[in-house]
Amino acid sequence: MEHFWIDAAGLPAEITAQHPLTRRLCHDYEIAPPQSPAVLTACAEPETAMRLADGTASPAYLEFLCIHDSLAAQLPAHHRFLMHGAAIAFDGAAYLFTAPSGTGKTTHVRLWRQYLGSRVTVVNGDKPFLSLEPDGTVRVWGSPWAGKVPSVSHSAVSACWSAARTASAACRRNRR
């Protein structure tokens, strides 16, 4: 077993992992052990692993998903949550694209980067952290669960409240 800490939307989270893959996937978010106890703790619970097992995922990847679920369950108590969506920063504001898997979130990120170049930074390609700050603002943070597009920014970006649900594949076909 390995213990390490990550930054989970500004909160220290202690991770207990059996598989080296988990630490590798969390590497960009790893922090030094905090002076005070971790606010969040996560390890792979056998019940969660059984629920997520579909026969195709490796035990190491199942552990990574279990840790995701464990953190996701604890975050709301701290005014934070993980959201399924792709997040970019553009001119200092975060934009979040939400939709079911396979409907074009990654494509939207790629197109924004293609047409707007260096003004666009990928915050997270699959499951960013969101936090509600004491002043009422929402911030978007990267997370280790980045999907197909690697996160570039690991700092928080103020959201502009412009979450967009991407069009379904059928709608995209009709417009081509």
Regions found by a protein language model. Give the residues of each.
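Hydrophobic positions on the alpha1 helix immediately C-terminal to the Walker A/P-loop
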Residues: 108
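Conserved lysine of the Walker
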Residues: 105
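A noncatalytic interaction/capping subdomain that flanks phosphate/NTP-handling catalytic cores
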Residues: 1-101, 111-123, 129-176
